[in-house]
């Protein structure tokens, strides 16, 4: 019997408990101290601009090899200093806000802010992009070791004048759970964009049907108009994608584009939210606005939906 986790993210008592912890005098005192420390690591953009102008004027007056050496040294040490401040800011944010919340729900959760989920997972969800960037890699303390990451996928093209243009194909979140599905090959459920390309369904960079895949339709007209199923395993596709999964995916499409990829080893979902979650605060005002319960709400709905998906699939296998 597989353990189910969906209720952990729909239970109002957990939200209530997090707010109680946050509002306790001890936690308020701790958060006040933490926020003051984080503010010390915020670099004022105005100071950066003034400093850059001053250095430029001073070096321009010299215009010799020594000025170039000084400029190189300044850039090197400034980058090193900025990176150190950013790392300290990230550690404070992770330890005192993200982990403080997530460990209340799944105690063994870990976070590496400057890493991303496995590149293969990203490529299989958005296969027609060229480059992939991500951050905030979270490994949740559940039986599946569910992984989370922000993700951006983009392509680069060159115009007739030789100028490079970057196009963002996807911006949002990716979730992946290791799961022995018994699938022979893989199953892809990709969103359909409005309009057709050369008379064919437009999937954007989610990838069209390949030669080894078979297109499968469901009894839901709403689903068939919003998603395409491409699979190498007809039996498990029809077994897994039952009315509960269809309903769940239909609900998601009202909020954002969602893509599902499954193979014999894992289940993954991408949410095209057009924004990164858990961005580091850039100003002192943003630091003041940080809240345990607010950080939890940012990811709660996506985790609830993802664990619902896993629970339903687990019942079938």
Protein language model annotation of sequence segments:
Residues 74-100:
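Transmembrane-cytosolic junction motif
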Residues 1-40:
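Cytosolic juxtamembrane N-terminal segments of multi-pass membrane proteins
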Residues 54, 58, 77-80:
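Hydrophobic membrane-targeting alpha-helices
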Residues 29-37, 60-63, 84, 88:
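Membrane-helix interfacial "entry" motifs
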Residues 99, 103-155, 161-317:
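Charged, low-complexity intrinsically disordered regions
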Residues 5, 9-12, 89, 93, ...:
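Alpha-helix boundary/N-cap detector
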Residues 35-54:
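Transmembrane alpha-helical segments and their cytosolic interface motifs
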Residues 56-73:
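Hydrophobic alpha-helical transmembrane segments
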């Amino acid at each position: 019997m597989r353990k189910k986790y969906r209720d952990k993210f729909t239970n109002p008592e957990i939200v209530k408990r997090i707010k109680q912890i946050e509002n306790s005098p001890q936690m308020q005192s701790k958060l006040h101290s933490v926020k003051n420390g984080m503010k010390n690591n915020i670099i004022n953009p105005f100071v950066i601009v003034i400093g850059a102008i001053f250095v430029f004027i001073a070096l321009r007056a010299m215009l010799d090899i020594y000025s170039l050496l000084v400029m190189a040294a300044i850039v090197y040490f400034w980058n090193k200093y900025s990176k150190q401040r950013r790392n300290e800011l990230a550690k404070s944010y992770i330890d005192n806000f993200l982990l403080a919340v997530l460990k209340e729900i799944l105690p063994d959760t870990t976070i590496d802010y400057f890493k991303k989920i496995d590149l293969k997972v990203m490529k299989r969800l958005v296969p027609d992009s060229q480059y992939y960037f991500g951050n905030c890699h979270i490994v949740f303390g559940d039986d599946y070791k569910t992984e989370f990451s922000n993700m951006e996928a983009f392509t680069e093209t060159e115009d007739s004048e030789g100028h490079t243009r970057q196009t963002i194909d996807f911006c949002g979140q990716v979730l992946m759970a290791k799961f022995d599905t018994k699938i022979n090959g893989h199953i892809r459920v990709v969103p359909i964009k409005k309009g057709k390309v050369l008379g064919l369904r437009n999937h954007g960079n989610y990838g069209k049907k390949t030669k080894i895949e078979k297109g499968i339709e469901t009894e839901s007209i709403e689903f068939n108009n919003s998603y395409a199923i491409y699979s190498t395993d007809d039996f498990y596709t029809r077994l897994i994608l039952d009315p509960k999964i269809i309903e769940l995916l239909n609900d998601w499409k009202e909020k954002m584009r969602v893509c599902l990829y499954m193979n014999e080893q894992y289940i993954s979902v991408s949410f095209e939210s057009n924004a990164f979650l858990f961005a580091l605060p850039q100003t002192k005002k943003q630091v003041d606005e940080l809240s345990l319960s607010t950080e939890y709400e940012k990811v709660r709905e996506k985790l609830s939906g993802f664990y619902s998906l896993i629970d339903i699939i687990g019942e079938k296998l």
